[in-house]
Curated annotation (Swiss-Prot):
HAMAP family: Lgt (MF_01147). The chain crosses the membrane at residues 27-47, 66-86, 104-124, 130-150, 181-201, 208-228, 242-262. This is Phosphatidylglycerol--prolipoprotein diacylglyceryl transferase. Belongs to the Lgt family. It comes from the Bacteria. It is a multi-pass membrane protein. Its EC number is 2.5.1.145. It comes from Shewanella sp. (strain MR-4). A 1,2-diacyl-sn-glycero-3-phospho-(1'-sn-glycerol) binds at residue 149. It is found in: Cell inner membrane. GO terms for biological process: lipoprotein biosynthetic process. Pathway: Protein modification; lipoprotein biosynthesis (diacylglyceryl transfer).
Length: 268
């Protein structure tokens, strides 16, 4: 007996239509974008709170700078990563596919690379070490991750594999078979559990880079676990018959995260 998908309208409210220069526009506020907005505001509040308690190491102005470039990194990196990692064939056939953002498609691993690029720039601009910036940012990242997974669930996308567990759901775009609600698993692990883990760990270590390492380790492990029940991307399938692209991209995160946590104290 499968649970019914709640079928929440992905659009909260529509505006218009508006006719501009002969073109009709009907902008809309969607739950997917709204969840990210809520996540961004919550992350901003927490970062400002951390800055206020940093004994002058961070100012709110510096946090605003970090958020601005971090946001750009997430959007640009997430889109580029999605196209290169998951739809490279589309890009080769039509490079303009990269700019078709309205069709959806973001990659966490691409967004991570974008954020890393932004943090390198902020570290240079504010004359800090890279990990001084990364350790500041890492504890709030799960907020955005969790918000995004709720958006995925409302959209009825990125569902799991066919299953007979009691909480399985039939998704409108997933066929008649009941499936794992893998978006909710990711919300619970990558959002809630990872946030609590990083909050706890950040209070118990002063080692430079360790909090960043715990984020990489925790996210990588959680992603590898959930990918075992998440439906593989249709255009990619499984590599070597058992690994998804998400798992392949997460394994280096686990290894580098372990290195950052276990490396000798003081080594940069």
């Amino acid at each position: 007996m499968a649970l019914n998908f709640p079928n929440i309208d992905p659009v909260i409210v529509k505006f218009g239509p508006f006719d501009i220069f002969g073109q009709t526009f009907e902008p809309a506020l969607r739950w997917y974008g709204f969840t990210y907005l809520v996540g961004f505001v919550a992350a901003m509040w927490l970062l400002n709170r951390q800055a206020d308690r940093s004994n002058g190491l961070w100012s709110r102005e510096q946090v605003s700078d970090l958020l601005f470039y971090g946001f750009l990194g997430v959007i640009l990196g997430g889109r580029i990563g999605y196209v290169l990692f998951y739809h490279f064939d589309y890009f080769l056939a039509s490079p303009m596919y990269l700019f078709k953002i309205s069709e959806g498609g973001m990659s966490f691993h691409g967004g991570l690379m974008g954020v890393i690029t932004a943090m390198i720039y902020i570290a240079w601009k504010q004359k800090r070490t890279f990990f001084a910036v990364a350790d500041m940012v890492a504890p709030v990242v799960p907020i955005g991750l969790g918000a995004g997974r709720i958006g995925n669930f409302i959209n009825g996308e990125l569902w799991g594999r066919v299953t007979d567990v009691p909480w399985a759901m039939v998704f409108p775009s997933g066929g008649p078979e009941p499936r794992h609600p893998s978006q909710l698993y990711q919300f619970a692990l990558e959002g809630v559990a990872l946030f609590l883990l990083l909050y706890w760990f950040s209070k118990r270590t002063k080692k430079v880079g360790a909090v960043s390492g715990m984020f990489l380790l925790g996210y990588g492990i959680f992603r590898v676990i959930v990918e075992t029940v998440r439906q593989p991307d249709a255009q990619l399938g499984l590599y070597w018959g058992f690994m998804t692209m998400g798992q392949i991209l997460s394994v280096p995160m686990v290894l580098f995260g372990l290195y950052l946590i276990l490396r000798p104290e003081g080594k940069q």
